[in-house]
Amino acid sequence: MMIKLIVNADDFGLTEGTNYGIIDGHINGLVNSTTMMMNMPGTEHAVRLAKEYNLLGVGVHLVLTAGEPLLKDVPSLVGENGSFHKQSVVREGNINPEEVEREWTAQIEKFLSYGLTPTHLDSHHHVHGLPILHDVLERLAAKYNVPIRRCEEDRAVHPFSDVFYSDFYADGVTEDYFVKLKERVQGEQTVEIMVHPAYIDPELVKRSSYVMDRVKELRILTESELPEGIELVKF
């Protein structure tokens, strides 16, 4: 009875320090998958690394709550400064799903334009779990033939795992996290764990409030070994 594990590093492309942390977590640790942000300062750098380290599965980290959109004509998605709304505003639901679909399509198409093949889709701040965007995700999953990160909601769209854990984060980043994993998972399930390893650079400090713990995550991801009965799998 093997538990199949995907350790996905979010925020590939956020900054160069983030990118190097993810690659280090892949080469020397448990990270076997990542998702790329297409509208960030480190995106081009992430593309180069993705091609260099092609054993790392790379999907698209759909963005709606950080940086600026790729498209100009998406008024419901941006504030007066032209940047995406904060997460709290998006969660109020005053966004136009049609604009989200166009913007997310542009993000996926930009990923494809680099000659990369996406393994799956997920989203920054997990906004793809919003009920208002359910139909958008169904169409994108079908159009690009990719699975999507499981949401806590019952209406998960084409999920690729039986279980999704987002608690390896902040206070949940513990030395024994992976050792205790077996106690939490039943039988032959596929499990995804979301992680955020990084090396700190000035751009990360500017763009994220989650900084120091990323370095701790990276250390634990590179020092931990999986218990018997758990194997890393790719999509």
From Swiss-Prot:
Q: What EC identifiers does the entry list?
A: 3.5.1.-
Q: Which GO terms describe its biological process?
A: polysaccharide catabolic process
GO terms, molecular function: deacetylase activity; hydrolase activity, acting on carbon-nitrogen (but not peptide) bonds, in linear amides; metal ion binding
List the PANTHER family: CARBOHYDRATE DEACETYLASE, YDJC DEACETYLASE FAMILY MEMBER
Q: What does this protein do?
A: Probably catalyzes the deacetylation of acetylated carbohydrates an important step in the degradation of oligosaccharides.
Q: Family per UniProt?
A: Belongs to the YdjC deacetylase family.
This chain's protein is named Carbohydrate deacetylase
Native organism: Bacillus cereus (strain ATCC 14579 / DSM 31 / CCUG 7414 / JCM 2152 / NBRC 15305 / NCIMB 9373 / NCTC 2599 / NRRL B-3711)
Print the organism lineage. Answer: Bacteria, Bacillati, Bacillota, Bacilli, Bacillales
